[in-house]
């Protein structure tokens, strides 16, 4: 999905 921060994918 979208990466908002390192290791944070939705």
UniProtKB/Swiss-Prot annotation:
Q: Does the keyword Isomerase apply?
A: yes
Q: Which compartment or compartments is the protein found in?
A: Cytoplasm
The entry's other comment says: In plants, there are two types of TPIS, cytosolic and plastid.
* Enzyme Commission numbers on file: 5.3.1.1
Q: Which UniProt keywords apply?
A: Cytoplasm, Gluconeogenesis, Glycolysis, Isomerase
For this protein, what reaction is catalysed? Answer: D-glyceraldehyde 3-phosphate = dihydroxyacetone phosphate
Upper classification of the source organism reads:
Eukaryota, Viridiplantae, Streptophyta, Embryophyta, Tracheophyta
Keyword Isomerase: yes or no? yes
Any single GO molecular-function term of the entry would be:
triose-phosphate isomerase activity
What pathway is this protein said to act in by its record?
Carbohydrate biosynthesis; gluconeogenesis; Carbohydrate degradation; glycolysis; D-glyceraldehyde 3-phosphate from glycerone phosphate: step 1/1
Cleaved signal peptide residues: none
Transmembrane feature ranges: none
Q: Can you tell me which family this protein belongs to?
A: Belongs to the triosephosphate isomerase family.
Q: How does it assemble?
A: Homodimer.
One GO biological process this protein is involved in is:
glycolytic process
**Protein's UniProt name:** Triosephosphate isomerase, cytosolic
Q: Name one GO cellular component term.
A: cytoplasm
């Amino acid at each position: 999905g979208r990466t908002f921060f390192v290791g944070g994918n939705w």
